[in-house]
A protein has these predicted regions:
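Short, charge/polar-rich alpha-helical segments
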Residues: 1-18, 47-48
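Short E/K-rich amphipathic alpha-helical oligomerization segments
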Residues: 17-48
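Solvent-exposed, well-ordered amphipathic alpha-helical segments
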Residues: 16, 23, 70-74
Length: 75
C-alpha cells in the first residue's frame, strides 16, 4: 500500500466539523423569543451558514476517506 500522510486531511476534516458545530450553535442561539422580521432573517442567514459548513465538512470527510482507501486498499 502507499505511504500517504493522511494527517493533514484529518486535521482539515476536524476543523471543518468544528466550524459546522459552531454554526449550528450560532443558529440555535438565534432561535429566541424575538419574533421580529430582523431576528427571523438573521436566523435564516445562520441556517444558510449551517448548510454551507455542513457541505464543507462532508467534502473534507470524503477527501480524508478517499485518502484512507488509497492508503489501505490501493485505490
Amino acid at each position: 500500500m502507499e505511504n500517504l500522510n493522511c494527517a493533514p486531511l484529518l486535521q482539515n476534516y476536524r476543523q471543518a466539523v468544528d466550524a459546522w458545530v459552531n454554526a449550528i450553535r450560532a443558529e440555535e442561539a438565534l432561535a429566541a423569543n424575538d419574533e421580529s422580521m430582523v431576528a427571523m432573517e438573521q436566523w435564516d442567514t445562520a441556517g444558510l451558514h449551517v448548510h454551507d459548513t455542513e457541505l464543507t465538512a462532508k467534502k473534507a470527510r470524503d477527501l480524508y476517506k478517499n485518502a484512507l482507501r488509497k492508503k489501505n486498499y490501493g485505490f
